[in-house]
Amino acid sequence: MSGGLDVLQMKEEDVLKFLAAGTHLGGTNLDFQMEQYIYKRKSDGIYIINLKRTWEKLLLAARAIVAIENPADVSVISSRNTGQRAVLKFAAATGATPIAGRFTPGTFTNQIQAAFREPRLLVVTDPRADHQPLTEASYVNLPTIALCNTDSPLRYVDIAIPCNNKGAHSVGLMWWMLAREVLRMRGTISREHPWEVMPDLYFYRDPEEIEKEEQAAAEKAVTKEEFQGEWTAPAPEFTAAQPEVADWSEGVQVPSVPIQQFPTEDWSAQPATEDWSAAPTAQATEWVGATTEWS
């Protein structure tokens, strides 16, 4: 498919990307029309996809996309969430029309509805999940390109790109590769220099994982600010005037306070106290008389 040109041959770095993303790993089931793209079967039943055939079909799909004069006439679709971000990134890079999420039935056939479109080329992520746009494309003679796994049905698919269309990394990498080849064939970017866009931007990320990472980053930033604040706080300045003393043993004068003298008395020389036993007796008699009078 590359025509024997060295410039179109698959590079070693591309093979490493495919292997890292698991693009060569298919499923345990095999469709009879996908047998031509299979390299081998593992002992655990997983089929290995021939990456050479994947690269050839990728170049063929890129040539078909470049052949469309108006980039907006190319519709790229992904109903599964693993390919929605990749579809939007591909559309932003190449100028295609994305449909991420649920495909409204009748978009290609019902002229009454507001979402009616007449594209010239259709690219889908999964023929099984995106069966509705493929079926409608067959009604309006629309050529189709699809990322196909080992068990994907090839009905209504004109150009099948064999790859792992289940994994988020594999799907993102395939859309990134397709966008890069389209831009290279258009002459937008050079083949001599690597594309500055990273494949990570095409990968699907779980919203819960993104939220957890944001919370962890926020907590780390707050902790860092508190730590820096403790060490960077200015030291308090003491403005109280300190007495200048040359010799500390002689400089400080302690005022002498006279000790107050209290007169001492001889407690044994005091007169004897009265007889305490007589007074209570008299009082008691008076109280008895008073009580007698009451009775």
From Swiss-Prot:
- Which tissues is it found in, per the record? Expressed in most neurons and in a subset of glial cells. The overall distribution of LR correlates with that reported for laminin-1 but also with brain regions classically associated with prion-related neurodegeneration.
* SUPFAM superfamilies named in the record: Ribosomal protein S2
On this chain, the residues bearing N6-acetyllysine are: 52, 89
Annotated region Disordered: the residues are 266-295
Enter cross-link residues for Glycyl lysine isopeptide (Lys-Gly) (interchain with G-Cter in SUMO2): 89
Q: Where are the [DE]-W-[ST] repeats?
A: 230-232, 247-249, 266-268, 275-277, 293-295
Q: Name one Pfam family in it.
A: Ribosomal_S2
Cellular component, GO annotation: basement membrane; cytoplasm; cytoplasmic side of rough endoplasmic reticulum membrane; cytosolic ribosome; cytosolic small ribosomal subunit; glutamatergic synapse; neuronal cell body; nucleus
- Map out region (Interaction with PPP1R16B) in residue numbers: 54-113
| UniProt-listed Gene3D superfamilies | Glucose-6-phosphate isomerase like protein, domain 1 (3.40.50.10490)
Stretches the record annotates as Laminin-binding: 161-180, 205-229, 242-295
Assembly and partners are described as: Monomer (37LRP) and homodimer (67LR). Component of the small ribosomal subunit. Mature ribosomes consist of a small (40S) and a large (60S) subunit. The 40S subunit contains about 33 different proteins and 1 molecule of RNA (18S). The 60S subunit contains about 49 different proteins and 3 molecules of RNA (28S, 5.8S and 5S). Interacts with RPS21. Interacts with several laminins including at least LAMB1. Interacts with MDK. The mature dimeric form interacts with PPP1R16B (via its fourth ankyrin repeat). Interacts with PPP1CA only in the presence of PPP1R16B.
**Other comments?**
This protein appears to have acquired a second function as a laminin receptor specifically in the vertebrate lineage. It is thought that in vertebrates 37/67 kDa laminin receptor acquired a dual function during evolution. It developed from the ribosomal protein SA, playing an essential role in the protein biosynthesis lacking any laminin binding activity, to a cell surface receptor with laminin binding activity.
User: What's the name of the protein?
Assistant: Small ribosomal subunit protein uS2
Encoding gene per record: Rpsa
